[in-house]
Amino acid sequence: MFDPKLKEALGRVQKPGRYTGGEPGSVYKDKEKVDVRFAFCFPDTYEVGMSFLGEKILYELLNRHENWWCERAFMPWLDMKAEMERLDLPLYTMESKDPLTAFDAVGFTLQYEISYTNILAMLDLAGIPFYSRDRDEHWPLIVAGGPCACNAEPIADFFDVVQLGEGENQLPSICAEIEKAKKEGGVSKKELLLRIAKIPGVYIPAFYDVTYCEDGRVKAITPNEPGIPARITKAIIKDLNEFAPPTNFVVPMVGAIQDRASIEVLRGCVRGCRFCQAGFLYRPMRQRDASLLNKAAQDLCANTGYEELSLSSLSTSDHGQLEELLDDLNEWAPKEHVSLSLPSLRVDNFSESLIEKTTKVRKSGLTFAAEAGTQRLRNVINKNVTWDEIEKTCTIAFNAGYTAVKLYFMMGLPTETMEDIEGIAETAQKVVDLYYSLPKRGKGKGVQVTISCACFVPKPHTPFEFVPMDTEEMLRAKQKHLLESVHSRKIKVNYHDSTTSFLEGVFAKGDRRLAPVIVEAYKRGCYFDGWEECFKYDTWMQTFADLGIDPAFYCQRAIGLDEVTPWSHMDYGVTHEYLVREYNKALAAQTTQPCNRACHGCGANHLLGGPCFDYSQNLV
């Protein structure tokens, strides 16, 4: 039965299915018979959160333990947030409808820097104090994980526990310590955190002090408790085959942004694109066996009823058994009317065989990431793709009947000039011209080439962490020049808002002094900052000014190669020396080959205790 207040709220909002729960695949347990209750919170709408594969992995993993119960919570949309505040209805989980304060731990996934005010909004709706220092052992532990944990410093003061790296071993270990402490009784919050701090990859922000230089740079980050490491090394799953993919998703009531079956075929990437934070955070690359993936995929589609299967990873076409896997999947998928999609295909290893094996049921859209408009700039960012490869790939696609292609680029890249911006338009025009030059193209059909252009944001743990981000004026000038450089109605241009990218850049490289800014901006009405209709840029800028913080200090200045950064105490495997070496190669427009062809000494092999690949085998 729903609480009367909840029933009233649901009757007054759009899409009440976002908040009702009861979806197929949901896990229900007797809360009186479980020892640990964990609330997995996604700081965005239900539709966005239900697209997140990481939540599905950890939800199934924790709920395999009979005496643990993992439930879900999402950020309510504007109308529901207002109703919950009006009715004094605390934020609750989808399964039990219990408030977040009833849980032992409340975990947030940090997927995007612009979601930080939504975290505060969810804590506020739950009646939970923002700052860790204001919560004793009677409050739930507030836990964070995900890619933005690689520099969680702007929000570190809000969290009791931050997980660096991969959570499959880490999160169950945290829950086990919570269970042990509850059974012992009388364990203080500090004692529990000291125990949790011993788990590989766990960062307890309260156990570190940060000092600053007179010019505002970080001076030092030092542990303040005995036995706490000076640097925290990320957690990693050495063998992905030891963790089978989830085979029974919660199927959403309201259509998710990506409403399909999804299975992670590999983790990490061998390519070494210098702009790509994920490529460095998840090193080294590890893949699952084709036989395991085929069985899991078949079970997943049977259990959920989905008719589209996505083979997910940073670079799916680099899986060493991809052709074998596709052959196995095509033994059963067409019979079950299940289509296959490979969302991360690369221009340089796209083939007729791949396109034939993934279009037996229906065609999905084709998106290729060229990233930069000229070969010089592609060399700078180590995007080892040439025009000849782009031409070959588009030829294969057009001959297979495709008439629409999306090309993904970035602007604001290091060393970029207006000639590189013109190169984006020229590349798109060459693709249009290529289509009309092919004799096999569909008669009477036109072509549509979409340019999708993101603003480059330098990120920690990459070779470009040292570079300043373009100013908003520079980015707007480049966007204008791109539009003026496109002369064909066959080409459509989309680009990102530079103001949200600026805020993303500030938090990506920010430090603990930003926490009060985030709190104050939230109090002034900033949340859902990633949504164009909700973003209050002027409010953010006024908040920075009122608190005496210059946001440009964080993202629009060069970082010294020997400078202590807010993330210097976080070890994701790749050494600082390697990042500097790659940065210098970028300035010289020199490329680095994929690391499955030759080891370049990035340092990530120490996470596995040996070589990342068997270089005696032909891995190319």
How should each PLM-predicted stretch be described?
Residues 40-41, 299-406, 411-450, 454, ...:
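Conserved SAM/AdoMet-binding glycine-rich loop
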Residues 78-79, 154, 209-213, 320, ...:
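Flexible glycine/acidic-rich beta-alpha junction loops that bind and position SAM and/or redox cofactors
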Residues 76-223, 463-511, 519-533:
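Glycine-rich beta-alpha loop elements in corrinoid/cobalamin-binding modules
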Residues 7-39, 46-47, 205, 211, ...:
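N-terminal [4Fe-4S]-dependent radical SAM core
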